[in-house]
């Protein structure tokens, strides 16, 4: 009798395992998991955002060795995790030590270590660094399916769609807006082919198109004048920022945004590093506040 019970139990486990089997198309091809992963390591911030959206907790995150790189809204859904280094160069040793049963990697950043990662655990390869808003939502849906939360993710995406529509209704449709990141010697315009640019476009705003095939071109003040947005939103990566120097240039006052005092600084982590459901909602909320001349929430 005991042997029979053990046989039935083993069969039940097999049925449960196959009940959770999922197959998707990732950036490498067909990807299948036979059971729901329990020990997940993510190598991009957007993947942590997606897991948080369905309350799945990763054991490891490539957080650039700084937990505050993760948005507070995302952290609220997670428990303390192990950092596995930077997104650009995650530590294979740290990842292996966690004994993951799923690694979610970025097809742009991690193609070079894909085979090495596969020696540790199954690797779901998705876009993150160079994705658009629509592609990010598709990736979130894939992640939801692979962690056994397909229905929950679909519900969260519907909620997200409704929230974004509410924020969009509070913005003047068709307003020309430009967002860019500013360093000491460089300003990068995020066009509608980038994640942030496409989030703003989804809100009904008029975002610059790609320039000469470049989705995130480095431009000068004269080129910015040619774009001439009604609103200019800037994420300053450095304290010494080229845009701050431009503001002392006589040409600056020729910008419509400058003339109307519609130049705003935004959090670089939220607007440029993070991508995902929570991140898009924060950007939408920030944009409404900016357009209505309200102070932004300080990110901690």
Swiss-Prot record:
Keywords from the named record: Ion transport, Iron, Iron transport, Periplasm, Signal, Transport
CDD domains: FhuD
Induction: Induced 1.8-fold by hydroxyurea.
SUPFAM superfamilies for the chain: Helical backbone' metal receptor
Outcome reported for the amino acid change (mutating residue 93 to A): Retains 10% of wild-type citrate-mediated Fe(3+) transport
Pfam families: Peripla_BP_2 (PF01497)
Effect the entry attributes to changing residue 246 to C: Retains 8% of wild-type citrate-mediated Fe(3+) transport
Classification via InterPro entries: ABC_transptr_periplasmic_BD (IPR002491), Bact_iron-sidero_bind (IPR051313)
Impact after mutating residue 222 to A: Retains 26% of wild-type citrate-mediated Fe(3+) transport
Domain of life: Bacteria
Fe/B12 periplasmic-binding domain ranges (all copies): 39-295
An individual GO BP term: siderophore-dependent iron import into cell
Compartment(s) where it occurs, according to its Swiss-Prot or TrEMBL record: Periplasm
Family matches, as PANTHER family: FE(3+) DICITRATE-BINDING PERIPLASMIC PROTEIN (PTHR30532:SF29), IRON III DICITRATE-BINDING PERIPLASMIC PROTEIN (PTHR30532)
Purpose: Part of the ABC transporter complex FecBCDE involved in citrate-dependent Fe(3+) uptake. Binds both iron-free and iron-loaded citrate although it binds iron-loaded citrate with a higher affinity. Binds different forms of Fe(3+)-citrate as well as citrate complexed with various representative Fe(3+)-mimics (Ga(3+), Al(3+), Sc(3+) and In(3+)) and a representative divalent metal ion (Mg(2+)). Can also bind various tricarboxylates in iron-free and iron-loaded form.
Entry protein name: Fe(3+) dicitrate-binding periplasmic protein FecB
Underlying gene: fecB
């Amino acid at each position: 009798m005991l042997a029979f019970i053990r046989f039935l139990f083993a069969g039940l486990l097999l049925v449960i395992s196959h009940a959770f089997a999922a197959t998707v198309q990732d950036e490498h091809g067909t990807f299948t998991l036979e059971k729901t992963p329990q020990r997940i390591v993510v190598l991009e911030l957007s993947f942590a955002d997606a897991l948080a959206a369905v309350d799945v907790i990763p054991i490891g995150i490539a957080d650039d060795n700084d937990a505050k790189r993760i948005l507070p809204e995302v952290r609220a859904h997670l428990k303390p995790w192990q950092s596995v280094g930077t997104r650009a160069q995650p530590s294979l040793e740290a990842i292996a030590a966690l004994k993951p049963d799923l690694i979610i990697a970025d097809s742009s950043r991690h193609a070079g270590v894909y085979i090495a990662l596969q020696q540790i655990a199954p690797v779901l390869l998705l876009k993150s660094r160079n994705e658009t808003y629509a592609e990010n939502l598709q990736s979130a849906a894939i992640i939801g399916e692979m962690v056994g939360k397909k229905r929950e993710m679909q519900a969260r995406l519907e909620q997200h769609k409704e929230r974004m529509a509410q924020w969009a209704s509070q913005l003047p449709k068709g307003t020309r807006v430009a967002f860019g990141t500013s360093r000491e010697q460089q300003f990068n315009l995020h066009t509608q082919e980038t994640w942030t640019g496409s989030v703003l476009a989804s809100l009904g705003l008029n975002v610059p198109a790609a320039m000469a095939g470049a989705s995130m071109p480095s431009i000068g003040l004269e080129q910015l004048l040619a774009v001439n947005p009604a609103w200019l939103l800037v994420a300053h990566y450095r304290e010494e920022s080229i845009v701050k120097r431009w503001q002392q240039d006589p040409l600056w006052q020729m910008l419509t945004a400058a003339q109307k005092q519609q130049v705003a600084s935004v959090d670089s982590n939220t607007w440029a590093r993070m991508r995902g459901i929570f991140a898009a909602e924060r950007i939408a909320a920030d944009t409404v506040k900016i357009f209505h001349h309200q102070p932004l929430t300080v990110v901690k």
